[in-house]
Structures are given as C-alpha cells and as structure tokens.
Amino acid sequence: MADLKTNLLGFVMNSPIIGASGTVGYGVEYEELADFSRIGGISGKGLTLHGQYGNKGERLWETPSGLINSIGLQNPGVQHFIDVELNEMLELRQKYGTVVIANLGGHSEEEYVEGAAMLSDSAVDIVELNISCPNVKVGGMAYGVKAEAAGEVVRMVRDACKKPLMVKLSPQAENIPEMCKAIEAAGADAISLTNTFQACAIDLEKRKPVFNNIFAGLSGPAVRPIALRMVWQAVGAVNIPVVGLGGIATGRDALEFIMAGATAVQVGAANFANPRAMETIAEEMAAWMDKNGVKTLDEIRGCARSNG
C-alpha cells in the first residue's frame, strides 16, 4: 500500500496534504468532517500582530472555475491565537500528529518582527510568513512584489524567529526565480506558493465592482496551471523545500505538483466545495500510486524535471 508520509522541515507528516491558510479555520472546525489521519498539517487563519475585523461588503464571489475572496485578514491577533486557538490546534497535533503552522502577515517590518518573535516562543511547529501584505511605508505595495523588499523583511523575521520559517509568495512577484533566491538567501527554510491572484468582478445589477477594494484574490482550478508553472520555477531556483498550492482539487492535481518537485502541497478553495477534500485528495493519490506501483512519494518527487 502506498505510503504518503512526507518530511517537511524535520516534521514527518501523515501525508503531503496541508490545509491552506484561510480555508480551514484552525483545523478544529473540520475535525468531525475529515479523517485527520490523512492530513499532514494545518496552516491556521492568517494572523496579524493586532486583531483585525477584515473587509466590509462582499467577501466571496464564485466564478465559473474558482472563487474570489476579499476577507481582509480578519483574525483575533497573535496573542489571542497563542492563548486560545493554538491550544485547539495542539489538540489536533496530539491526536493525529497534525503539523501546526501559524500564518503571519503584517503591515510593517516592525509588526512582522514582533509577531514572529511571539510565535517563536509558542508551541507552533512552523511559521508561514505571508509577504503578500501591503507595505504602508511604500504606498501599499506588497512586500512580495520586489525581491529586495521581500528579502529584507524575511531577514528581519529570521533574526527574530527560532521556528522553521516558510515564506508564502505572491503570484504578483516581478520575477519568481529571483524572488525565491532572495528569500532563500535571507534565511527562509521553505517556500510556499502561490497565494491568490489579483482579480476583479462586476455586479451587473448594481453596475459596480463586487468588492469595496475593487480587486480581490482569485483561487481555485482556474489558477492551477499557472501556480504549477511557478512551483516548477521555484524548485529550479532554490535548494530549500517548496510547498505548492493553487487550485489543487484532486489527487492527480496534487501529484502534478509533487512530480514538479514540490515537497508538499496545500489545499485551499477545494475545502469550500467539499469539506472532505483533503482526505479525498490523499486517498486519490494513494490509489494512483498503488495502481502504478509507486510505494513512496520520494520515488516520483521531481520526476517530471528529468523527463521534460
């Protein structure tokens, strides 16, 4: 029988499947719905140093092949997470071996550093740094657009954080390979990509943009081939693990990312369509492996690179 166990930064996960931040709450919301023995880890709801109420107006808008969201990082803040939600995630770790990942955003270098330092002293396993947040000091441009700015914030967080550090990239980055190299040089232990793609929707009846901020984040099957291309580029640019995400909805989707060289994958929008998506994807991966005589993921990880 296929063995889906995956080593990510020294943590041996049940499978390469990680619940993507913002789509599974803190994991506990899914405990009665999903078989956590099939799930490798959970990246909790995106955090900021101080709690945020999130965006007003419409927050979700379905497209023919995806979902546009404008949540606005609604969250209770880092300290509240450490005091309350983290304890619930740690129960999942104790019961099922689920790797606990804290996703951290920020609106200034100082916020990133302070939040990372607090998480570093907590019981989380991995800190996932979301650098898609706007930098208020430079007119709101996301940290993840230019390699120099991204490298600088990662370097500062690295100095403050003793935990394994995974950096989540924006697809709006000017140059994915150069961005990955800058982040690796700044001390990142792993890279996850890609975050949502900027998108727009118009409400015909109201004759105005759906979202108050006009632009919002597109995820789902529509973005998968582009995300796969970016993962391919990232794997070729760095020597640290790459976690792939973007439109993964089936076992075959996940296996594409593994064959492109990803160490693990995250599942996001699919969880809204099917609360059991993560375990279903793991089961489909195992079934394909059994059918094709593949015993472990290491046998096929990156295989497409040598056959391309």
Give the location of each predicted region.
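Small/polar glycine-rich anion-binding or flexible loop at a beta-alpha turn
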Residues: 248-252, 274, 306
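Alpha/beta enzyme core
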Residues: 107-243, 252-267
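Surface-exposed amphipathic alpha-helices with a cationic face
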Residues: 7, 11, 82-95, 120, ...
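C-terminal helical cap(s) of enzyme catalytic domains, especially alpha/beta-barrels
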Residues: 54-64, 202-216, 258, 270-295
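Extended, intrinsically disordered, low-complexity segments
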Residues: 224, 283-308
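N-terminal capping/small domains of soluble enzymes
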Residues: 1-100, 106
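Short gly/pro/ser/thr-enriched loop/turn and capping motifs at secondary-structure boundaries
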Residues: 48-53, 134-136, 198-201, 272-274
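Hydrophobic faces of well-ordered beta-strands that scaffold small-molecule active sites
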Residues: 4, 17-20, 40-44, 100-104, ...
